[in-house]
Amino acid sequence: MSKQTLILLYGGRSAEREVSVLSAESVMRAVDYNAFEVKTYFITQSGDFIKTQEFIETPGDDEKLMTNDTVEASQAIKPSDIYEEDAVVFPVLHGPMGEDGSIQGFLETLKLPYVGTNVLSSSVAMDKIMTKRILEVAGVPQVAYTGYIEGEDLEAAVAETLEKLTFPVFVKPANMGSSVGISKAENESELRSAIDLALKYDSRILIEQGVVAREIEVGILGNTTVKTTDPGEVVKDVAFYDYQAKYIDNKITMDIPARVPVEVMTQMRAYAAKAFRALGGCGLARCDFFLTEDGAIYLNELNTMPGFTQWSMYPLLWENMGLSYSDLIKELVVLGQEMFDKRESHLI
């Protein structure tokens, strides 16, 4: 039986490129090499495409994907050179220029099927402010928030925040993930400093009401038919679940399934599917919720390319549902091909 080519894109231009490499290495080891051969391409911080390794069998434990320290300029290619007939692309890219519709539009221009959400849902879900506005209309509960866009009246934004929210608040770049650039502010001075920090990563800033809550996550899989997982819980060993704790120090543990009442579990799964559909989602996503002591549920964010390392919540949630990491990858490829075929059929 001939194998299908699975193209892994990893690295990228965003601050989350380290996570991308870890995710891609996990995917390359979990792939069923009876069904796929894998070709990998590293995207540098400057946006260059580098042809890296190819695998026809499971790589050894010490095999690492090539990155900035090991690639050579002679390996650089034109981005369009990744095209291969009958291949499917898995863009294991997190954050801006990877998860925001940019790479998805590029792949659609090349007529390449790909894993994950389409251009529209990727770009909307990447922007936390736009996501909030759409989910408000859809009736999905969220914590109170304000926003600031660079160039607008900063003093007015601070005043609105002081009026509508109470400290502590969380200040986030609207278009970043993995806790990059996020700060907790306990007073007005810290709020202003947090806005300055967030502006280094984005020109659109979300300011959210801080809540004392458990962090519960639900996996989503599907196109027209949407499946969800039982929730899992992030059990933090640090005060703030930041990028360093999440990916570098690994100072978190997870309870899968989360220890929550059945009615809470059911409601979260319903909200997750509702949010996914409201944003036009397809392929996959992870929906992150807050659960307060009084039982209130708030949707925090919807991540269209969640971490894919062997210790990441998304694949572990599906393993708990009986879908192995390897079979999850197969299912994502099928869903990606299905969406590609549908897009092509609409071009009449």
Swiss-Prot record:
Residues reported in the UniProt entry to bind ATP: 162-217
Example of a GO cellular component annotation carried by this entry: cytosol
Catalytic activity, EC: 6.3.2.4
ATP-grasp domain segment(s): 132-334
Needed co-factor(s): Mg(2+); Mn(2+)
GO biological process: cell wall organization; peptidoglycan biosynthetic process; regulation of cell shape
Entries under PROSITE patterns matching the protein: ATP_GRASP (PS50975), DALA_DALA_LIGASE_1 (PS00843), DALA_DALA_LIGASE_2 (PS00844)
Subcellular location: Cytoplasm
Residues where Mg(2+) 2 binds: 301, 303
Example of a GO MF term: D-alanine-D-alanine ligase activity
Highest taxon, organism lineage: Bacteria
Pathway membership: Cell wall biogenesis; peptidoglycan biosynthesis
Broad EC category: ligase
Pfam families in UniProt: Dala_Dala_lig_C, Dala_Dala_lig_N
Co-factor: note: Binds 2 magnesium or manganese ions per subunit.
Keyword list, A-Z: ATP-binding, Cell shape, Cell wall biogenesis/degradation, Cytoplasm, Ligase, Magnesium, Manganese, Metal-binding, Nucleotide-binding, Peptidoglycan synthesis
Catalytic reaction equation(s): 2 D-alanine + ATP = D-alanyl-D-alanine + ADP + phosphate + H(+)
Protein residues bound to Mg(2+) 1: 288, 301
Gene3D superfamilies assigned to the protein according to its UniProt record, in alphabetical order: 3.40.50.20, ATP-grasp fold, A domain (3.30.1490.20), ATP-grasp fold, B domain (3.30.470.20)
Family of the protein in this entry: Belongs to the D-alanine--D-alanine ligase family.
Role description: Cell wall formation.
Protein name: D-alanine--D-alanine ligase
Organism: Streptococcus thermophilus (strain ATCC BAA-491 / LMD-9)
